[in-house]
Amino acid sequence: MSEFVTVARPYAKAAFDFAVEHQSVERWQDMLAFAAEVTKNEQMAELLSGALAPETLAESFIAVCGEQLDENGQNLIRVMAENNRLNALPDVLEQFIHLRAASEATSEVEVTSATALSEEQLSKISAAMEKRLSRKVKLNCKIDKSVMAGVIIRAGDMVIDGSVRGRLERLADVLQS
């Protein structure tokens, strides 16, 4: 986990509460995602680690973001710059997404397979995970040829490894012991 998670949580909570109150959760997530990407820019990273005055840093950051940030998003940037916390924006986004998922009773489920899965397979996985987790799921599919065949499903700290690679690794462990 990133060192900024504890720092990011109150900012994410404040942004999320504000977004819910103003029915703009999607817009806020988009603004935070854009601002988080800006912090990853090499030149911006140098500015963030430099000795600029917080007001100058905030205005420079806001200028780079342009119209991607509304007035309230700009205010968040100013507050975070004032407290030297702009580096925590990627973690603020991550915490915001977790808060949104919790409020919408959804879970992000990562499905890794060797080949693209059919719509039927994805709907079966989705239904099974919704039943198991007792909430709606959003599938994020990845293709990894090293899986060989089968799938690996990750939801939070739960991992279901139904891949050939996983079976071979478990077999190798048994044979070595």
From Swiss-Prot:
Annotated Pfam families: OSCP
Membrane topology: Peripheral membrane protein
Keyword list, A-Z: ATP synthesis, Cell inner membrane, Cell membrane, CF(1), Hydrogen ion transport, Ion transport, Membrane, Transport
GO biological process: proton motive force-driven ATP synthesis
Protein localization: Cell inner membrane
Gene3D superfamilies: N-terminal domain of the delta subunit of the F1F0-ATP synthase
UniProt entry tagged with the keyword Cell membrane: yes
GO terms assigned for molecular function: proton-transporting ATP synthase activity, rotational mechanism
A Gene Ontology term for the protein's cellular component: proton-transporting ATP synthase complex
Source superkingdom: Bacteria
Family: Belongs to the ATPase delta chain family.
Record's subunit section: F-type ATPases have 2 components, F(1) - the catalytic core - and F(0) - the membrane proton channel. F(1) has five subunits: alpha(3), beta(3), gamma(1), delta(1), epsilon(1). F(0) has three main subunits: a(1), b(2) and c(10-14). The alpha and beta chains form an alternating ring which encloses part of the gamma chain. F(1) is attached to F(0) by a central stalk formed by the gamma and epsilon chains, while a peripheral stalk is formed by the delta and b chains.
Record function comment: F(1)F(0) ATP synthase produces ATP from ADP in the presence of a proton or sodium gradient. F-type ATPases consist of two structural domains, F(1) containing the extramembraneous catalytic core and F(0) containing the membrane proton channel, linked together by a central stalk and a peripheral stalk. During catalysis, ATP synthesis in the catalytic domain of F(1) is coupled via a rotary mechanism of the central stalk subunits to proton translocation. This protein is part of the stalk that links CF(0) to CF(1). It either transmits conformational changes from CF(0) to CF(1) or is implicated in proton conduction.
Protein name (database record): ATP synthase subunit delta
Organism encoding this protein: Salmonella typhimurium (strain LT2 / SGSC1412 / ATCC 700720)
